[in-house]
Structures are given as C-alpha cells and as structure tokens.
Amino acid sequence: MQKIAVIGAGSWGSALAMVLADNGHDVRLVGRRQEQMDELNERHTNESYLPNIELPTTIRGYTGMEEALGGVEAIVLVVPTKAMRETVRKIVPYLQKAVPVIHASKGIEPATHKRISEMIAEEDASTNRISSITVLSGPSHAEEVALRQPTTVTVASADDEAAKYTQNLFMNQQFRVYTNPDLIGVEIGGALKNIIALACGVTNGLGYGDNTKAAIMTRGLAEISRLGTTMGAKPLTFSGLSGLGDLIVTCTSVHSRNWRAGRMIGEGLSMDEVLEKMGMVVEGIRTTQAAYELSEKLEIDMPVTKALYSVLFNGIDPYQAAEELMGRVKRHEVESLYRS
C-alpha cells in the first residue's frame, strides 16, 4: 500500500482515485470546495461529477495541500491545463522528499505552446521535488472507469522505470495499463484529439452524418500525426491507445464534453453560451488555439484545426468552414499523412 495524493476532484480525478483505492492504496483526493470534500468523507459520493456512484471508503477528501501531501509517495495531477502551473507551485513546498508525479490532463498551454510535462518540469526546476513525470492517457471516460468497466490506457515517461511504476500503481482486472516510451506522442495525441472531437460535434450539430464524422476523424488523425512527428513524436504512437483509441472514444460518445460543446456550436450557440451551458472546462477550445498557432509557426498543414479555429475565434459560420474544407486543392491521401 502506498500513500497517493490525487489533485483534482472532478470526474476523472475521482475515477482514478477509485482505481487506486481498489488496488489497496491510501488515497487522498484534493478538491477546492469544502462541501464537496465533506460529501466525500461523510457519504462517500461525489454527485456533482459522478452521480449515483459510491466511492471506496479508503478515499479521503482534503482541501488543504499541506495536510493532504504529508508523507505521500506519489502525486497524480488531474487539473485543467490552465491551472497546472499554479497547482505545481502550490504542491512543491509541501513535498518532504522528491516524489514521482503522474499527470492525467490533456492540453497544450496557449501562451507558450508547451506540453503539460514541460510545464510541470519548468515549475519544479528550482526545487527538484519531482523525481519523474509520467503521463496517463487513452480512451477512458471517467463514468465508465467509475463503473469498473474494462478500460485500457497507456502511460509514458522519459524514465522507463517511472512508466513501469505507474503501470503497477494503476493496473488491475478492469483497468489495463500499457507503457510507451514516447512521452511527446502520448501527450500530443491526448491533447489534439479534443480538437477533432469538437469538430465532429460541430458536424453533428450541422446535421451531417457518419460519412462526415469518419472523414473528420481520419483526416484529423493525419494532421495530429503531422504536427506530432514534427515535434519529435514517433508516428506509430498515433495508431495506439493515446492516438486512435482516444480519438474514437472522444469523437463518437455523448460522454465527451468536447463533442457536446461542438454540437452546440454547430447548432448555432455562441462560445460563451456553450461554456455557460457546459459548466465545466472544455479543453479542446484552448487546445485549438494553441495547435493552430503551432501549425502556423511550424508550417504544418492542419486544415481541420484551422477550420475549427476560424469558427471559434474568428466567427466564421460553421457551414462556410465545412464548404471551404471540402473545396481545398486536390491531394494524394497517403503522401500527406506525415508532411504538409
């Protein structure tokens, strides 16, 4: 049994805390709202994020970092990209020794275009309280993980031993974990699939069917691969769990908040209206901005991302964006997979 702190008490953080508790670990789940943590400690539920689910009694809720982090042997970060730097700055002073950090967030920082592991490393550069950084990613709706339905994910780190440690920490009969040495590819695939899920949602809102969805997913994976390999990822990673696997589950399920947000946009709602209705973070919106800017900087052809960016940030009508996508210059399919 190990003492593990899970920072972020939303649906995904709570589901991962359940996996760790099922594996016999002492789990401290850290949230911002005292009433939410009181509910967890008294009734062992988190109805706002995982309705009708009973959490293991070995999960304890905390709002204070100092109390939650005392004596922990590993930290799992499950917070939005925009909160990642601040969260790392808050936890580092309370670490009594260097510990491994596992993050299960998906995004790219718009201001710097940094991946999440890069952000974490930068915030720990002066203290060296983090011994290793691992990402956990893959096709994994929190609702299904909490119901203990069979799920497979991948973990990646620059440190192979850290990846194996994370695999052992999480793996059980319902939650199968693979390792992958391609940290860049796993992070890029997990982040950029949210863009394609948004785009698939938009096409659904416009009334288009499965043909359109399949086209967006397939060509979307091609541009994810182009950007990822340019940034140093291995092409094969994008055909795995953190690439194709995550893309399928996020683009085809009503559980996906990015897909649902995209559908509302396709139906004519403004971005502000969508965010108000969702009531939760839609990572794909910020990631669309970051990926578009990266593609311009690196001169990578990403037409789906560009079209979605024009809808989200330039006010282009979704029908017009779809027409422009279909009217692009003739191309060879395979030759354009890994180059612009």
Curated annotation (Swiss-Prot):
One of its GO terms (biological process) is phospholipid biosynthetic process. NADPH binds at S11, W12, R32, R33, K106, A142, R257, V281, E283. One of its GO terms (cellular component) is cytosol. Keywords: Cytoplasm, Lipid biosynthesis, Lipid metabolism, NAD, NADP, Nucleotide-binding, Oxidoreductase, Phospholipid biosynthesis, Phospholipid metabolism. The active site is at K193. It catalyses: sn-glycerol 3-phosphate + NAD(+) = dihydroxyacetone phosphate + NADH + H(+); sn-glycerol 3-phosphate + NADP(+) = dihydroxyacetone phosphate + NADPH + H(+). It is an enzyme of class 1 (oxidoreductase). Pathway: Membrane lipid metabolism; glycerophospholipid metabolism. One of its GO terms (molecular function) is NAD binding. Its EC number is 1.1.1.94. It comes from the Bacteria. The keyword rRNA-binding does not apply. It holds the Pfam family NAD_Gly3P_dh_N. Its main location: cytoplasm. Sn-glycerol 3-phosphate binds at K106, G138, S140, K193, D246, S256, R257, N258. Disulfide bonds: none annotated. It is found in: Cytoplasm. Belongs to the NAD-dependent glycerol-3-phosphate dehydrogenase family. Catalyzes the reduction of the glycolytic intermediate dihydroxyacetone phosphate (DHAP) to sn-glycerol 3-phosphate (G3P), the key precursor for phospholipid synthesis. NCBIfam families: PRK00094.1-2 (NF000940), PRK00094.1-3 (NF000941), PRK00094.1-4 (NF000942). This is Glycerol-3-phosphate dehydrogenase [NAD(P)+]. It comes from Shouchella clausii (strain KSM-K16).
